[in-house]
Curated annotation (Swiss-Prot):
Its main location: cytoplasm. This is UDP-N-acetylmuramate--L-alanine ligase. Belongs to the MurCDEF family. Keywords: ATP-binding, Cell cycle, Cell division, Cell shape, Cell wall biogenesis/degradation, Cytoplasm, Ligase, Nucleotide-binding, Peptidoglycan synthesis. It comes from Synechococcus sp. (strain CC9311). One of its GO terms (cellular component) is cytoplasm. InterPro entries: Mur-like_cat_sf (IPR036565), Mur_ligase_C (IPR004101), Mur_ligase_C_dom_sf (IPR036615), Mur_ligase_cen (IPR013221), Mur_ligase_N (IPR000713), MurCDEF_pg_biosynth (IPR050061), UDP-N-AcMur_Ala_ligase_MurC (IPR005758). It is an enzyme of class 6 (ligase).
Amino acid sequence: MADSIQPEKHIHFIGMGGIGMSALALILAERGHSVSGSDRKLTPAMQALETKALAIFESQVSKNFAHLQSRGIEEPLVVVSTAIPSTNPELIEAQRLDLTIWHRSDLLAWLIEQQPSIAVAGSHGKTTTSTVLTTLLATVGEDPTAVIGGVVPCYGSNGHKGNGRLLVAEADESDGSLVKFKASLGIITNLELDHTDHYRNLDDLIETMKTFGRGCKRLLINHDDPILKEHFQADACWSVHHVETADYAALPVQLDGDRTIADYFEQGQKVGQITLPLPGLHNLSNVVAALAACRMEGVPLEALLLAVTELRSPGRRFDFRGEWQDRQVVDDYAHHPSEVQATLTMAQLMVQSGRSPLPRTPQRLLAVFQPHRYSRTQEFLNAFAQALVSADALVLAPIYGAGEQPIEGINSELLARSIRLIDPNQPVFVASTMEELAGLVKQHSQPDDLILAMGAGDVNSLWERLSQEGIGGEASCSPAIAA
């Protein structure tokens, strides 16, 4: 496959608006390829490509290829993602025209093979770890190429064509296609059953990740994860709990709502101290993974420890959106019980410690959660309830189906009942529509609240609904703050 894309080849992305597809399109465009793409609606990621793409279509219809032909593009390479169904009219037309069709993972695998590469996999923390890794490398002058599932603050984009020797890629495990990646260094952050629409059980996930690991020249794993520790052999490991058994480790000295201070160890010896402007033990683990990868690539330690002090989270990872009626609104991508628990724990640390990277220290936590997929909600119903009960108050949005058909009886009201079984006194409110959601937040929030919107769907529109629809007060927007 390494020689399959010639410089003059035009590449057309069906579903260009997705975070992973747009990153690939951006990099290919910056490498000089002619690109085009389509999606059902114009997304911010597509808007960023408007000046770089030959054509962008706000519909996925067969006539898009006729338009390309009118522009002199006869045989484009067509790229699709798992999200594109076999019934998609544009895909059907590409098949009728007998065009070459690649899955998104084929294109990413090709990019990974073109230069020394680091692929970041795992159930949780992939985006943050790959963003931190990219940022550290950029800060010390390495300028990596990056294909990330979130916006990297130092580049302001999810895709970047660097001039350095390394490529950093986020390796999504959701459909198992990461087994195609042959990276110079693979990282696995943790393993926990998710994406039950693809994986039958945990053993199925473990075998897929083992195949990914075997395909990498070197493998770096999280020694604190019990599944990785038991089932995987690796070239190196990291920990935020143990020094003696890890090649790279950080032991927390101070955990506050606005920062983390930890002693940093390599091969059992303390070699420095980390001052991290990101709260939460899970963020410390992500940063140590990135540090370990940099060190395995020969980056000097002193420059890295200095770079750590300037880190910021990727977009939609505890992303401060602004203030509304003396309430601070934060957006987070958490959509699995473990992610929800880690995010709520970090938010409560800000409330309880009186220290926060936000403009003002919040006094109470109002969580707004949008379950993602009916199958995931059904599979992890009790785990979601156990995680969400730690909020001071809770508003639930309708389930975001992400293309799934509804499952009878599986809805946000069922989740609310499960939460009330754990704590009958928990204030929990259920919105029947997204339009109703902002009204419930207005009704049940209070000044000095941290309004934390969590989910992988469109719950991130809550800020716009609060600030633009003028329901009850003025709103002000501030730059995203790392957390």
